[in-house]
């Protein structure tokens, strides 16, 4: 699963997830899966959606993952009293704003990529839509 190799600090503040997305255009492939909602994608969810796409297109075409989980989420163990410091890092998330391109695909037909992204979207906790590259 995806996670940073090294970070400057082990733990992070919760923070807020406001604003609009950077990376809102299809850059590498012809088709993309675009986020409509804001939310958090865990490394497991990103990997699960990637597997759904690759299983459907069966080694043809190319896929780009445009999100990376770089925020650590901590949890304290069950039945532990309040206080005594921040919990341990349990998993990593990517913060998603509306408009962010999550996945891109090239080398397959539009119908196949639509169906593959539909399968991937079922694995994700946010609403998404299918987009194509804008050619000027």
Swiss-Prot record:
Any one GO BP annotation for this protein: translation
Keywords: Ribonucleoprotein, Ribosomal protein, RNA-binding, rRNA-binding, tRNA-binding
Protein name: Large ribosomal subunit protein uL16
Cellular component annotations (GO), alphabetically ordered: cytosolic large ribosomal subunit
CDD domains, sorted: Ribosomal_L16_L10e
Entry annotated with the keyword Nucleus: no
UniProt family annotation: Belongs to the universal ribosomal protein uL16 family.
Matching InterPro entries: Ribosomal_uL16, Ribosomal_uL16_bact-type, Ribosomal_uL16_CS, Ribosomal_uL16_dom, Ribosomal_uL16_sf
The protein's assembly and partners: Part of the 50S ribosomal subunit.
Function: Binds 23S rRNA and is also seen to make contacts with the A and possibly P site tRNAs.
Gene Ontology molecular function terms on file: rRNA binding; structural constituent of ribosome; tRNA binding
Pfam families the UniProt entry points to: Ribosomal_L16 (PF00252)
């Amino acid at each position: 699963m995806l996670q940073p190799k090294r970070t400057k600090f082990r733990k992070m503040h919760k923070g807020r997830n406001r604003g609009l997305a950077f990376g809102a255009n299809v850059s590498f492939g012809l088709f993309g899966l675009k986020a409509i909602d804001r939310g958090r994608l865990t490394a497991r969810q990103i990997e699960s959606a990637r597997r759904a796409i690759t299983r459907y297109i069966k080694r043809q075409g190319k896929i780009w993952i445009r999100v990376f989980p770089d925020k650590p989420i901590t949890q304290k163990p069950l039945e532990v009293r309040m206080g005594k410091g921040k919990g341990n890092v349990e998993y990593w998330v990517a913060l998603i704003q509306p408009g962010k391109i999550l996945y891109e695909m090239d080398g397959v037909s539009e119908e196949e990529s639509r169906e593959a992204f539909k399968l991937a979207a079922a694995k994700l906790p946010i609403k998404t839509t299918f987009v194509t590259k804008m050619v000027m």
